[in-house]
Regions:
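Long, hydrophobic N-terminal alpha-helical segment
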Residues: 1-22
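Active-site-proximal loop/helix of nucleotide/amide-processing enzymes and allied scaffolds
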Residues: 56-134
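Short, surface-exposed acidic-centric catalytic microdomains
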Residues: 26, 33-51
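Conserved small/polar residues in nucleotide/adenosyl-binding loops
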Residues: 137-144
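Short, surface-exposed loop/turn motifs that are enriched in glycine and acidic residues
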Residues: 2, 51-55
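Short loop/turn motifs at secondary-structure junctions
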Residues: 23, 38, 73-75
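Short, well-structured hydrophobic secondary-structure segments
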Residues: 24-29, 66-70
């Protein structure tokens, strides 16, 4: 199972909407305990391809995010990207470029602007795709300084 704070979902959604008409992308750092992956920090990266059909993360931003993940004692949970004009499922290119069977691949479809769809996937070494459950959580009051 993958846990994502609603606030982080909103952050990803906002980043992807601002990136339209192109795909947007980023990395996800967090913790892994048993079979539960908890996203603790979302890293919004630049799609240097500036394309609505594929993405390449800015290498400098990617390196900076990986350094921050390590400095915070997090693990690489996965990455995300948007599909501005297609469903929330891995394309053939997404599967081909999925290099690590241990991380999550999140895809946010903006095909229906009023009803975005975020799904998490695993891609094994044979390029078989598995849909993973996403649990949305709220920040605890002490994390925001306010009552929820």
């Amino acid at each position: 199972m993958l846990k994502l704070k609603k606030e982080d979902y909103e952050k990803i959604l906002d980043h992807c909407r601002k990136g339209l008409p192109n795909e947007s992308c980023g990395l996800l750092g967090g913790t892994i305990e048993d079979d539960v992956k908890t996203i603790e920090k979302v890293y919004l990266l630049t799609n240097i391809d500036e394309s609505n059909e594929h993405f390449s993360m800015d290498p400098k931003e990617q390196l900076s995010a990986i350094k921050d993940i390590r400095q915070n004692g997090y693990q690489m949970i996965g990455n995300f990207h948007s599909h501005p004009e297609s469903p929330s499922r891995p394309s053939e290119e997404d599967k081909r470029l999925a290099f690590d069977p241990n991380i999550e691949y999140l895809i946010l479809s903006l095909m229906d602007a009023e009803n975005p769809v975020l799904k998490a996937f695993g891609v094994d070494k044979e390029k078989n795709v598995t849909v993973h459950a996403v649990s949305y959580t709220h920040l605890r009051a002490h994390e925001t300084g306010r009552n929820l």
